[in-house]
């Protein structure tokens, strides 16, 4: 079997907003990598045995006395090192160079003139002339290196940053003041490929097929002939976990699908058809709508609703697990960003917006071993694996759906009547987005039920019914988002269909708030 972890890159995180993007680019190249906080020990690095090390950017300044530094062992480990932005600055300082606060802060596009050949820039240029090859890059820095460490040479320069890139070819140390991991740097992926493949010598074994083979083998080794239980929601993560486990242990996997009454139109039936009928999984559907809605009755606070939905899910799941007396393992769809954020919340090294339900979400009394086949994977990698396992593209590429479901898209108190109206309105919106080709152009689109009534006119009569808000956004990372400029005729068609086809809705509005200041979800 292919050893997909044989060659690996260690990325030390100094707090940059782009650090996870570095890891995703390295994985995209086909090489395994892990992202660790900057203050790791020499022993931890030795045990990980990286083939190369990347130092990330940071919002900190190297000119500040207590700003973070790379462990000294990084530069004594006899492996190539690439410093990006702050990573280049701390490399320079720690090896005897000098950094200063720049008179001209650089944020945005820049053109770096390349000089003195370096393996890092081999066969790279964007707008070269015979005398001066250049790279179009993305800068984001306020400090700069003003004196090189011994044995380094300048390999890139801009008018305001004379040392925009540097290298020590003998020790294979490289620094770039720009960000190769962002798409704005046109040749960024090629530059990282030069470092990871050509300089570090990593083989590109991190592929969907190899990851599946490795995951199946590890599951078999971990659980043997034991039985495993999985809460299958129909979302991408739990679906991929289910298929990996099914491939590894077959009928020893017990999937529990909790139908909480807060799902999209016909979603419960679709989950059963997909995983029960098509893939032949051992799956139990639990109709818990009345239990969830009963607990939510009279509750309007969003955070309280989230906690109730989470608690009831655990209770229902626990009731089902007790019926399976031979189960020894619990499978979860934890993915790598969950692990990173959970670790950060414990160490205080990063600001975490929300805790994830997949990390440590079940009570201590459920004394089962944990199986987490996706723990090393980013979301885009999970999708690729899902496609390779046979999940339909329409399902894999579906827009995100919140864990509490319609519980946080019905504003205020959640009632069955409201959920039923919202389900039908949302189905019309998504159907028209797909028919018009706009579903793929938006990152997330959904409907929200507003608990206010509005006067409308139907025929010769007046009606006093509920309001639906439509929401569609475009985003790269969901940290910021722009409202999608959907065509007026499309919005008009959706509005007319909802008001005419969903009895109980009298008005449809479109949310044109960006993030920030608004969040993507209303609750």
From Swiss-Prot:
Any one of the GO CC terms: cytosol
Biological pathway: Purine metabolism; GMP biosynthesis; GMP from XMP (L-Gln route): step 1/1
EC number(s) on file: 6.3.5.2
Top-level lineage group: Bacteria
Catalysis: reaction(s): XMP + L-glutamine + ATP + H2O = GMP + L-glutamate + AMP + diphosphate + 2 H(+)
Keywords: ATP-binding, Glutamine amidotransferase, GMP biosynthesis, Ligase, Nucleotide-binding, Purine biosynthesis
Gene3D superfamilies in the record: 3.30.300.10, 3.40.50.880, HUPs (3.40.50.620)
Family annotation (InterPro entries): Class_I_gatase-like, GATASE, GMP_synth_C, GMP_synth_GATase, GMP_synthase, GMPS_ATP_PPase_dom, NAD/GMP_synthase, Rossmann-like_a/b/a_fold
Active site: 85, 179, 181
UniProt binding sites for ATP: 233-239
Lineage of source species: Bacteria, Pseudomonadati, Pseudomonadota, Gammaproteobacteria, Pasteurellales
Pfam families, A to Z: GATase (PF00117), GMP_synt_C (PF00958), NAD_synthase (PF02540)
GO molecular function: ATP binding; GMP synthase activity
Disulfide-bonded cysteines: none
GMPS ATP-PPase domain ranges (all copies): 206-398
Stored NCBIfam families: guaA_Cterm (TIGR00884), guaA_Nterm (TIGR00888), PRK00074.1 (NF000848)
Glutamine amidotransferase type-1 domain ranges (all copies): 8-205
Subunit structure: Homodimer.
Role according to the record: Catalyzes the synthesis of GMP from XMP.
Name of the featured protein: GMP synthase [glutamine-hydrolyzing]
HAMAP family: GMP_synthase
Gene this protein is translated from: guaA
